[in-house]
Amino acid sequence: MTPLPAPAEAARGALAAALCYLFWGLVPLYWRQLAVVDAVELIAHRLVWSLVFVMAVIFYRAGWKELRAALGTRRGVGLNLLSSALLTGNWLVYVWGVNSGHVIECSLGYFLVPLLNTALGRWVLRERLRPAQLVAIGCAAVGVAVQLVQVGRLPWIALTLAVTFGGYGLLRKLSPLGPLTGLAVETTLLAPAAAAFLLWRQHTGEGALGHASATLQALVLSTGVVTAVPLLLFAYGARRIRLTTLGLLQYIAPTVQFTLGVTVFQETFDRHQALAFAFIWAGLVLYTVDNLRNLRAVTR
Protein backbone atom coordinates (compact mmCIF):
# COMPACT_ATOMS: atom_id res chain seq x y z
CA MET A 1 0.00 0.00 0.00
CA THR A 2 1.02 3.62 -0.57
CA PRO A 3 2.17 5.09 2.75
CA LEU A 4 -0.12 7.73 4.19
CA PRO A 5 1.27 11.03 5.43
CA ALA A 6 0.99 11.70 9.16
CA PRO A 7 -2.53 13.08 9.84
CA ALA A 8 -1.30 16.44 11.19
CA GLU A 9 1.12 16.90 8.29
CA ALA A 10 -1.53 15.90 5.76
CA ALA A 11 -4.02 18.35 7.28
CA ARG A 12 -1.52 21.21 7.12
CA GLY A 13 -0.62 20.25 3.56
CA ALA A 14 -4.27 20.14 2.47
CA LEU A 15 -4.89 23.55 4.06
CA ALA A 16 -1.86 25.05 2.30
CA ALA A 17 -2.89 23.61 -1.08
CA ALA A 18 -6.50 24.74 -0.63
CA LEU A 19 -5.34 28.27 0.24
CA CYS A 20 -3.11 28.25 -2.84
CA TYR A 21 -5.98 27.34 -5.17
CA LEU A 22 -8.34 29.76 -3.42
CA PHE A 23 -5.73 32.49 -3.91
CA TRP A 24 -5.49 31.65 -7.62
CA GLY A 25 -9.28 31.64 -7.85
CA LEU A 26 -9.62 35.11 -6.32
CA VAL A 27 -6.69 36.70 -8.16
CA PRO A 28 -8.90 38.16 -10.96
CA LEU A 29 -10.06 40.67 -8.33
CA TYR A 30 -6.45 41.81 -8.00
CA TRP A 31 -5.72 42.02 -11.72
CA ARG A 32 -8.91 44.01 -12.35
CA GLN A 33 -7.53 46.75 -10.09
CA LEU A 34 -4.62 47.01 -12.55
CA ALA A 35 -6.75 47.07 -15.71
CA VAL A 36 -5.53 50.57 -16.63
CA VAL A 37 -1.95 49.29 -16.91
CA ASP A 38 -0.81 47.75 -20.21
CA ALA A 39 -0.91 43.93 -19.98
CA VAL A 40 2.63 43.51 -21.37
CA GLU A 41 3.96 45.99 -18.80
CA LEU A 42 2.18 44.08 -16.03
CA ILE A 43 3.84 40.83 -17.09
CA ALA A 44 7.23 42.56 -17.23
CA HIS A 45 6.69 43.82 -13.68
CA ARG A 46 5.56 40.35 -12.65
CA LEU A 47 8.78 38.82 -13.97
CA VAL A 48 11.07 41.39 -12.34
CA TRP A 49 9.39 41.57 -8.93
CA SER A 50 8.85 37.79 -8.80
CA LEU A 51 12.60 37.40 -9.29
CA VAL A 52 13.32 39.88 -6.47
CA PHE A 53 10.92 38.13 -4.08
CA VAL A 54 12.04 34.60 -4.97
CA MET A 55 15.73 35.50 -4.69
CA ALA A 56 15.06 36.91 -1.21
CA VAL A 57 13.42 33.63 -0.19
CA ILE A 58 16.26 31.58 -1.71
CA PHE A 59 18.82 33.75 0.11
CA TYR A 60 16.92 33.16 3.37
CA ARG A 61 16.88 29.39 2.72
CA ALA A 62 20.48 29.32 1.47
CA GLY A 63 19.36 27.55 -1.70
CA TRP A 64 21.96 29.01 -4.08
CA LYS A 65 23.60 25.67 -4.87
CA GLU A 66 20.60 24.24 -6.73
CA LEU A 67 20.07 27.53 -8.58
CA ARG A 68 23.70 27.72 -9.76
CA ALA A 69 23.57 24.09 -10.89
CA ALA A 70 20.41 24.71 -12.92
CA LEU A 71 21.93 27.72 -14.68
CA GLY A 72 25.25 25.97 -15.28
CA THR A 73 24.13 23.41 -17.88
CA ARG A 74 23.05 24.03 -21.47
CA ARG A 75 20.20 21.51 -21.23
CA GLY A 76 18.97 23.04 -17.98
CA VAL A 77 18.96 26.53 -19.46
CA GLY A 78 17.26 25.37 -22.67
CA LEU A 79 14.51 23.46 -20.83
CA ASN A 80 13.86 26.33 -18.45
CA LEU A 81 13.92 28.91 -21.26
CA LEU A 82 11.12 27.00 -22.96
CA SER A 83 9.14 26.69 -19.73
CA SER A 84 9.73 30.43 -19.14
CA ALA A 85 8.24 31.24 -22.53
CA LEU A 86 5.17 29.07 -21.85
CA LEU A 87 4.67 30.54 -18.38
CA THR A 88 5.04 34.13 -19.62
CA GLY A 89 2.62 33.48 -22.47
CA ASN A 90 0.15 31.98 -19.99
CA TRP A 91 0.45 35.00 -17.68
CA LEU A 92 0.01 37.46 -20.55
CA VAL A 93 -3.11 35.80 -21.99
CA TYR A 94 -4.61 35.35 -18.52
CA VAL A 95 -4.10 38.96 -17.41
CA TRP A 96 -5.34 40.27 -20.75
CA GLY A 97 -8.34 37.93 -20.63
CA VAL A 98 -9.33 38.90 -17.09
CA ASN A 99 -8.99 42.63 -17.78
CA SER A 100 -10.85 42.35 -21.10
CA GLY A 101 -13.98 40.77 -19.61
CA HIS A 102 -13.25 37.09 -20.25
CA VAL A 103 -13.01 35.67 -16.70
CA ILE A 104 -15.46 32.85 -17.49
CA GLU A 105 -13.41 31.78 -20.51
CA CYS A 106 -10.24 31.94 -18.41
CA SER A 107 -11.87 29.58 -15.90
CA LEU A 108 -12.75 27.24 -18.79
CA GLY A 109 -9.05 27.05 -19.67
CA TYR A 110 -8.14 25.84 -16.20
CA PHE A 111 -11.03 23.37 -16.13
CA LEU A 112 -9.48 21.88 -19.29
CA VAL A 113 -5.97 21.56 -17.81
CA PRO A 114 -6.40 18.17 -16.01
CA LEU A 115 -7.81 16.56 -19.16
CA LEU A 116 -5.13 18.13 -21.34
CA ASN A 117 -2.47 16.85 -18.94
CA THR A 118 -3.88 13.35 -19.35
CA ALA A 119 -3.76 13.71 -23.14
CA LEU A 120 -0.17 15.00 -23.01
CA GLY A 121 0.75 12.03 -20.83
CA ARG A 122 -0.48 9.74 -23.59
CA TRP A 123 0.95 11.56 -26.59
CA VAL A 124 4.24 12.81 -25.18
CA LEU A 125 5.13 10.43 -22.34
CA ARG A 126 3.46 7.38 -23.94
CA GLU A 127 1.41 6.68 -20.83
CA ARG A 128 -1.45 4.20 -21.23
CA LEU A 129 -4.90 5.68 -20.85
CA ARG A 130 -7.84 3.87 -19.30
CA PRO A 131 -11.13 3.84 -21.28
CA ALA A 132 -12.77 6.30 -18.87
CA GLN A 133 -9.91 8.75 -19.40
CA LEU A 134 -10.37 8.56 -23.17
CA VAL A 135 -14.10 9.24 -22.79
CA ALA A 136 -13.35 12.18 -20.47
CA ILE A 137 -11.01 13.72 -23.04
CA GLY A 138 -13.67 13.14 -25.69
CA CYS A 139 -16.25 14.99 -23.58
CA ALA A 140 -13.90 17.97 -23.33
CA ALA A 141 -13.36 17.93 -27.10
CA VAL A 142 -17.13 17.92 -27.66
CA GLY A 143 -17.46 20.85 -25.26
CA VAL A 144 -14.93 22.88 -27.25
CA ALA A 145 -16.69 21.90 -30.51
CA VAL A 146 -20.04 23.06 -29.09
CA GLN A 147 -18.45 26.40 -28.20
CA LEU A 148 -17.15 26.71 -31.77
CA VAL A 149 -20.42 25.77 -33.49
CA GLN A 150 -23.00 27.36 -31.17
CA VAL A 151 -21.13 30.47 -30.03
CA GLY A 152 -19.48 30.95 -33.42
CA ARG A 153 -15.87 31.20 -32.32
CA LEU A 154 -13.13 29.02 -30.94
CA PRO A 155 -12.49 29.70 -27.23
CA TRP A 156 -8.89 30.69 -28.00
CA ILE A 157 -8.24 32.24 -24.59
CA ALA A 158 -9.25 29.03 -22.81
CA LEU A 159 -7.32 26.83 -25.23
CA THR A 160 -4.20 29.01 -25.03
CA LEU A 161 -4.28 28.97 -21.23
CA ALA A 162 -4.80 25.20 -21.15
CA VAL A 163 -2.04 24.46 -23.70
CA THR A 164 0.53 26.84 -22.19
CA PHE A 165 -0.13 25.73 -18.61
CA GLY A 166 -0.33 22.06 -19.60
CA GLY A 167 2.93 22.34 -21.54
CA TYR A 168 4.52 24.21 -18.66
CA GLY A 169 3.40 21.49 -16.24
CA LEU A 170 4.88 18.82 -18.50
CA LEU A 171 8.26 20.59 -18.62
CA ARG A 172 8.20 21.10 -14.85
CA LYS A 173 7.55 17.38 -14.47
CA LEU A 174 10.64 16.66 -16.56
CA SER A 175 12.72 19.16 -14.58
CA PRO A 176 14.49 18.11 -11.37
CA LEU A 177 14.03 21.58 -9.86
CA GLY A 178 11.58 22.36 -7.09
CA PRO A 179 8.82 24.98 -7.65
CA LEU A 180 10.73 27.84 -6.00
CA THR A 181 14.07 27.22 -7.71
CA GLY A 182 12.28 26.56 -10.99
CA LEU A 183 10.51 29.92 -10.79
CA ALA A 184 13.81 31.61 -9.90
CA VAL A 185 15.52 30.15 -12.98
CA GLU A 186 12.59 30.98 -15.26
CA THR A 187 12.38 34.59 -14.10
CA THR A 188 16.19 34.98 -14.17
CA LEU A 189 16.24 34.06 -17.86
CA LEU A 190 13.56 36.58 -18.88
CA ALA A 191 13.93 39.33 -16.25
CA PRO A 192 16.71 41.22 -18.13
CA ALA A 193 14.46 41.68 -21.17
CA ALA A 194 11.53 42.57 -18.91
CA ALA A 195 13.62 45.14 -17.02
CA ALA A 196 14.81 46.71 -20.29
CA PHE A 197 11.20 46.99 -21.47
CA LEU A 198 10.16 48.64 -18.19
CA LEU A 199 13.03 51.13 -18.41
CA TRP A 200 11.95 52.00 -21.94
CA ARG A 201 8.34 52.49 -20.77
CA GLN A 202 9.50 54.76 -17.96
CA HIS A 203 11.73 56.72 -20.35
CA THR A 204 8.84 57.35 -22.73
CA GLY A 205 6.57 58.39 -19.84
CA GLU A 206 4.17 55.48 -20.40
CA GLY A 207 5.22 53.39 -17.40
CA ALA A 208 2.97 53.01 -14.37
CA LEU A 209 5.66 53.77 -11.79
CA GLY A 210 5.88 57.48 -11.05
CA HIS A 211 2.91 58.24 -13.30
CA ALA A 212 0.03 56.60 -11.41
CA SER A 213 -1.57 56.85 -7.98
CA ALA A 214 0.31 55.57 -4.94
CA THR A 215 -2.23 52.75 -4.55
CA LEU A 216 -1.79 51.62 -8.15
CA GLN A 217 2.00 51.73 -7.87
CA ALA A 218 1.85 49.63 -4.69
CA LEU A 219 -0.31 47.07 -6.49
CA VAL A 220 2.16 46.95 -9.39
CA LEU A 221 5.10 46.40 -7.02
CA SER A 222 3.20 43.59 -5.27
CA THR A 223 3.00 41.44 -8.43
CA GLY A 224 6.00 39.42 -7.26
CA VAL A 225 4.37 38.57 -3.93
CA VAL A 226 1.08 37.71 -5.66
CA THR A 227 2.99 35.33 -7.95
CA ALA A 228 5.33 33.66 -5.45
CA VAL A 229 3.20 33.25 -2.31
CA PRO A 230 0.70 30.76 -3.81
CA LEU A 231 3.62 28.81 -5.30
CA LEU A 232 5.19 28.52 -1.84
CA LEU A 233 1.85 27.31 -0.45
CA PHE A 234 1.60 24.84 -3.32
CA ALA A 235 5.12 23.52 -2.74
CA TYR A 236 4.41 23.08 0.99
CA GLY A 237 1.11 21.30 0.35
CA ALA A 238 2.23 19.08 -2.52
CA ARG A 239 4.93 17.46 -0.37
CA ARG A 240 2.45 16.55 2.37
CA ILE A 241 -0.65 15.22 0.64
CA ARG A 242 -1.45 12.59 -1.95
CA LEU A 243 -1.44 13.53 -5.61
CA THR A 244 -5.11 12.49 -5.84
CA THR A 245 -6.02 14.93 -3.06
CA LEU A 246 -4.07 17.64 -4.83
CA GLY A 247 -5.92 16.80 -8.04
CA LEU A 248 -9.30 17.26 -6.35
CA LEU A 249 -8.28 20.57 -4.78
CA GLN A 250 -7.19 22.00 -8.15
CA TYR A 251 -10.83 22.51 -9.14
CA ILE A 252 -11.15 25.22 -6.47
CA ALA A 253 -9.37 27.85 -8.61
CA PRO A 254 -11.44 27.64 -11.83
CA THR A 255 -14.66 27.19 -9.83
CA VAL A 256 -14.01 30.42 -7.90
CA GLN A 257 -12.99 32.20 -11.13
CA PHE A 258 -16.17 31.02 -12.86
CA THR A 259 -18.28 32.20 -9.91
CA LEU A 260 -16.59 35.61 -9.97
CA GLY A 261 -17.15 35.91 -13.71
CA VAL A 262 -20.89 35.23 -13.39
CA THR A 263 -21.65 37.09 -10.14
CA VAL A 264 -19.09 39.84 -9.52
CA PHE A 265 -18.11 40.76 -13.08
CA GLN A 266 -21.57 39.82 -14.47
CA GLU A 267 -20.26 38.38 -17.72
CA THR A 268 -22.68 36.80 -20.17
CA PHE A 269 -23.24 33.07 -19.67
CA ASP A 270 -25.87 31.85 -22.12
CA ARG A 271 -27.30 28.39 -22.78
CA HIS A 272 -24.76 27.65 -25.53
CA GLN A 273 -21.87 28.32 -23.17
CA ALA A 274 -23.67 26.31 -20.48
CA LEU A 275 -23.90 23.34 -22.85
CA ALA A 276 -20.17 23.57 -23.66
CA PHE A 277 -19.28 23.77 -19.97
CA ALA A 278 -21.63 20.85 -19.21
CA PHE A 279 -19.68 18.53 -21.52
CA ILE A 280 -16.37 19.63 -20.00
CA TRP A 281 -17.66 19.28 -16.43
CA ALA A 282 -19.01 15.82 -17.30
CA GLY A 283 -15.55 14.88 -18.53
CA LEU A 284 -14.01 16.16 -15.29
CA VAL A 285 -16.48 14.19 -13.16
CA LEU A 286 -15.71 11.02 -15.11
CA TYR A 287 -11.97 11.73 -14.91
CA THR A 288 -12.10 12.28 -11.14
CA VAL A 289 -14.26 9.23 -10.38
CA ASP A 290 -11.99 7.05 -12.52
CA ASN A 291 -8.89 8.33 -10.71
CA LEU A 292 -10.45 7.62 -7.30
CA ARG A 293 -11.43 4.10 -8.35
CA ASN A 294 -7.97 3.45 -9.72
CA LEU A 295 -6.39 4.71 -6.49
CA ARG A 296 -8.52 2.34 -4.40
CA ALA A 297 -7.57 -0.57 -6.66
CA VAL A 298 -3.84 0.24 -6.40
CA THR A 299 -3.81 0.75 -2.63
CA ARG A 300 -6.06 -2.20 -1.81
List where the protein language model places each region.
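C-terminal transmembrane-helix exit sites in multi-pass transporters
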Residues: 96, 112-132, 255-274
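Helix-helix packing/entry segments at the starts of transmembrane helices
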Residues: 108-112, 177-189, 228-263
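Transmembrane alpha-helices of multi-pass small-molecule transport proteins
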Residues: 38-89, 116, 164, 185-201
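C-terminal-most transmembrane helix of multi-pass membrane proteins
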Residues: 2-4, 251-300
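Glycine-/small-residue-enriched transmembrane alpha-helix faces in small-molecule transporters
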Residues: 1-41, 138, 142-174, 196, ...
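Hydrophobic transmembrane alpha-helices of multi-pass small-molecule transport proteins
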Residues: 54, 129-148, 159-163, 272-291
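Structural motif at transmembrane-helix junctions in multi-pass transporters
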Residues: 36-41, 92-109, 232-249, 268
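Loop-to-transmembrane-helix transition segments
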Residues: 12-20, 64-93, 156-160, 208-229, ...
